[in-house]
Each structure stands twice: as structure tokens, then as C-alpha cells.
Amino acid sequence: MKLSKTFLFITALCCATPTLAIQNSTSSSGEQKMAMENTQNIREIYLAGGCFWGMEAYMERIHGVKDAISGYANGNTEKTSYQMIGLTDHAETVKVTYDANQISLDKLLKYYFKVIDPTSVNKQGNDRGRQYRTGIYYQDGADKAVIGQALAQLQTKYKKPVQIEVQPLKNYIVAEEYHQDYLKKNPNGYCHIDITKADEPVIDEKDYPKPSDAELKAKLTPLQYSVTQNKHTERSFSNEYWDNFQPGIYVDITTGEPVFSSNDKFESGCGWPSFTKPIIKDVVHYETDNSFNMQRTEVLSRAGNAHLGHVFDDGPKDKGGLRYCINSASIKFIPLAEMEKAGYGYLIQSIKK
């Protein structure tokens, strides 16, 4: 039987429609799953640290923080106000909403610790009273262990006992609109903390574990292994990064831990990459090197304990006077444009474009 063109068109359309519907349904389902996963990664923690104006503005500057709201927490009543918190025993508290894929609770707490006096009782900066006490209030029971470990590590840095209150969240009330985004509305308003400390990166050693020796031998080139593990030195002026001045970061070739920034790189004329300082002071350590009948200060990476190079006191005087002379074979350059994809998005704000 011969079929008409009209019949064939209608048949094709009918056959195609269910397939299209299935594709749309599948696409919609996938988008919903992604949205659900993204929502599941959004967490909340409540932080008290003196006047909430500064703490709110500080938290909002941190990579991975999605929102910060000023409020009152862990008082004795379900209602309060700015005028009443002295009577209801609420603490000025910032509700911090963050993406756990971008910043962990442990790292977020390290930022928090940078701007409080953890040994002070009912006092932060010039602010005094129970409403200005320090506190970490949680809703997820799993957060309690993370908070406990962070506080134990913090205590090792102080002789006095840490006085930060840790409790499940209760009686949280959002503060009056006047207090929300206060420092955005009043740029010269009162702030007891240096909010620019949020721009100083927190680099967690635990994120960059050291591979085994066998893994290093498989991963590194012979030159990279020789330099990082046996403290050898590559040739000057014929290495990869001595004349590279693109914006980005330099990471330990053995672990991936960030060690230097393009912000601090300069032309020293020595033929090796030269920096005025590490990206933060904690990512390197030093040993005395008496080899070749010289007394030098060796620079090693924190997580990988890899030999990076040496530091000398003939650097730019206006930038501290130091010159970190580093082997290209010990580091890997991550361009600014690739930092987010490579997992270093949290450092982008600290790199000058």
C-alpha cells in the first residue's frame, strides 16, 4: 500500500514526540538532581565574635561563603531585640551560609579564629558584655566533632584556656534591618576587626598529603625528583619559570600545596624564580644548609618537605629585603585563568590581575 506524504509526516511527528518528551524529562530530572546536590552542599554555622557588624562584613568576603546575616543567638527567650539582648542573654551572632564544596567548616573556623581573641571572656575589641562573647553554634550534630578538633588545635597556640562557647543553636533571631550589611551602608562605621584579613588565604596542609616515595618517582621527572628529594639545584637561566611573570600561583610539585604567588615574584638577575616571600608564611619551613662550605638557609615545603631552594637577604629592601631563590623543578605554575578549575579558586582574590 502506498502511503501519502501527509500520513508519513503525521506518523513521524507522533513517533518523535514521545522521544522528545522523554529527553526533556531526562534533562529536567538531571537538572533537578544537580540542583538537589548543590543544595545539599550548602551548610550553615552560627558565629559570635563581638560586634556583628564587622563579623558579617568579614565573613562575606571569604571564598565559599554565600551569605552572612546578623542576628542574636543562644539566649533564654525566643524573642529579643538589640535593646533587650543584655536581659535575654543572647550573643550577637552571624549566620554564615557556605558551600561545603568550596570551603570546609574547618577552614571557615580558621578564618573566624583570625579575627577574635579566643581567650577573652565577654569582651572583643572595645566591646564588653555577655552579648559580645565568642561562640560557635551548630545545627548539624556532625559539626560538633569538627568544631572540637578545631578548638583543640587552636588551644595549642595559647597558654590561657580558649573561652569560645560551643553549643547547639537555640533561639536565633534575625537582627533588625538597620544592622544588616551595616558596613556596606556605612563604610566608615565602627568595626572592631580588620575585615581585610579575609583576603589573606587560609591554606590547609591536610588538603595536600605527601605521596609515597614510589608515587613520587612515578609522578616526577628525574630532575624534579633529584631537586625535591635529594636537594640538588637545576641550571640557572635554562629552567621553566625564571622569566615567567604571568599572574597565578606556584605550587609544590610533590603535593600541590600553594607556596608562592606571582604577586611576590621579581626579576633578580640570578636565573632562577625569585620571590620576596611565600604566599603565606606557614607553607614553608627552614633548615640550615652547610653544604659546599657555605652557610645558607634552605627553604622546604610544609606538606611535602620538598627542597624548594634557599632564601637570601639581598632582595628588594622596600619589600622586606629577602630573596627566595627557588628551583623551577620544585614548583608548578597554575595560571590565574586556570586556578578555579584546578581547585585553587579560594586563592583567586589574593592574586593581582
UniProtKB/Swiss-Prot annotation:
Its EC number is 1.8.4.11, 1.8.4.12. Residues 43-196 are annotated as: Peptide methionine sulfoxide reductase A. The keyword Oxidoreductase applies. It comes from the Bacteria. It catalyses: L-methionyl-[protein] + [thioredoxin]-disulfide + H2O = L-methionyl-(S)-S-oxide-[protein] + [thioredoxin]-dithiol; [thioredoxin]-disulfide + L-methionine + H2O = L-methionine (S)-S-oxide + [thioredoxin]-dithiol; L-methionyl-[protein] + [thioredoxin]-disulfide + H2O = L-methionyl-(R)-S-oxide-[protein] + [thioredoxin]-dithiol. Keywords: Multifunctional enzyme, Oxidoreductase. SUPFAM superfamilies: Mss4-like (SSF51316), Peptide methionine sulfoxide reductase (SSF55068). Signal peptide: none annotated. Residues 213-336 form the MsrB domain. GO terms for molecular function: L-methionine:thioredoxin-disulfide S-oxidoreductase activity; peptide-methionine (R)-S-oxide reductase activity; peptide-methionine (S)-S-oxide reductase activity. InterPro entries: Met_Sox_Rdtase_MsrA_dom, Met_Sox_Rdtase_MsrA_sf, Met_Sox_Rdtase_MsrB, Met_Sox_Rdtase_MsrB_dom, Mss4-like_sf. HAMAP family: MsrA, MsrB. In the N-terminal section; belongs to the MsrA Met sulfoxide reductase family. In the C-terminal section; belongs to the MsrB Met sulfoxide reductase family. This is Peptide methionine sulfoxide reductase MsrA/MsrB. The gene is msrAB.
